[in-house]
Amino acid sequence: DKYSREKLNGGLENLSSYYLDRGYIRFNIDSTQVAITPDRKAVYITVNVTEGEKYKVTTVDLSGDIVVPESEMRAYLLLRDGQDFSQVQVTNTEEMITQRLGVEGYTFAKVNGIPEIDDEKKTVALKFFVDPGKRTYVRRIEFRGNTKSVDEVLRREMRQMESAPASSAQIEQSRVRLERLGFFKEVKAENVEVPGTDDMIDVQYTVEEQSSGSIGASVGYAQDAGLILGANLQQNNFLGTGKQVGIGLNSSKYQDLYSFNYVNPYFTEDGVSRGFSVFYRSTDLEEINVASYTTDTVGGTMSFGYPISETQRLGLRVGDHRPEVRAAGA
């Protein structure tokens, strides 16, 4: 592998992490030497370390302003008495408590795990200091990058509301809902501090539009039907409104079929969807010597979808069709 200072530093960091995550809290890299071989085609790397001994955790406590019930906060303490000290578990605990405070609106909370080391007993007493800061509220929710989709299509997916406490869970849930629409290649959420305040943020969602439609054509052949041609066009974000519109056409020697479908995913503000489809089919059975009559059929369906959870819907669909038989050539 080709030598680079950046790779060496990365390797040294990985080495430190390996030891710190396995109880060696006093691990230290004493020195590093890099020497070039006489033929100048390779290098020797010598790393001198002090491994130290393993340290056990004795106590794990919380301190500071505990705004969430302490019994609940303790569930996020990943280290327990008697376990080997692990820096990654300290970091994960800090992140989990910070995220939990973010759910309650404490966007700028800080959590620091402070180890008290007893070198004689080879133990560590951990104390997590919690500073929730002020509860934060959302001033505005803004959208960027939606060059095709109108703002309302994005805004109705929001679970985080303006003027409400900023919940990291609701902000993330809103981001996921935008992704599920299928209109965007990427969705990012960013909390932006409002100048002159320490308890207000703006939430900015940046999206990258992608194609939300499809067009297709088909050609086939069957002995009785002859050449079969088909075409369809489906747009799931029609004119940027979030509504679904589709048309289809199939034609052969003895049958023609035309169809149209439409879905409004927000027929009501609560997210109840309504859709309908219609079709017309003309079949000339005389063309394939089956019968001396033609059937014209008109039909359609109407459907409703009711959201019962974030990812599930209850659907209802009804349909009907009316065939008309007439003599061939009539």
Residue ranges and their predicted role:
Residues E6, A164-A330:
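Gram-negative/organellar outer-membrane beta-barrel architecture
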Residues D1-L181, K185-V203, V207-S212, G226-I228:
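Interaction-mediating elements
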